[in-house]
Amino acid sequence: MEKNILPIKKAVLIFFVFACGYFISALLRAITATLSPLLTTEFNLTAGDLGLLAGGYFLGFASMQIPLGYLLDKHGPKKIISAFLLIAIIGTVAFALAQSFSGLLISRILIGVGVSACLMGPLTGYRIWFKDEYQQRANAWMLMVLSMGFVFSTLP
């Protein structure tokens, strides 16, 4: 892809939009641990069931990594991240409305698929839109945002 360097103000805005998506990705990744007492009570889940819910997220996430590279190269990060976050929203709403373990599991897989672009999409965008000297800093800040998402996921 050809570089198309953005002005600094636009680059900062783009970073914050991407960072919000990555924060939500981290939050959704870890939230089953926070919700485990409620899920165990409400759905009569075992520890194995909770593990499957956590694994469902990673199954969806991992299954998209190879197609994601192709899609990012073909359509660009803006379109792909938007489309994938829509899938994550659908999965999150489905999780909130689920009436059974299978509904929860399918929702977690959808969430994993939906947030699978929240790291590689921004990294691709930074490569295209940011000056070379800002890319490493943006990547480091993204990892900090991930950590913040994990911390915030511990709050009820």
Which positions does each model-derived feature cover?
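Extracytoplasmic
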Residues: 13-45
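Small-residue-rich transmembrane alpha-helices and their cytosolic helix-loop interfaces
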Residues: 22, 54, 58, 85, ...
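Small-residue-rich segments within alpha-helical transmembrane domains of MFS-like 12-TM solute carriers
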Residues: 26, 30, 112-120, 151
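Residue-level signature of mid-helix packing/kink "hotspots" within the transmembrane helices
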Residues: 30, 58-66, 150-151
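Extracellular/periplasmic helix-loop-helix junction of adjacent transmembrane segments
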Residues: 35-62
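Conserved MFS/SLC helix-loop-helix module at the cytosolic interface between two early adjacent transmembrane helices
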Residues: 63-99
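Paired small-residue
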Residues: 91, 102-110
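Cytoplasmic helix-loop-helix junction between adjacent transmembrane helices
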Residues: 107-145
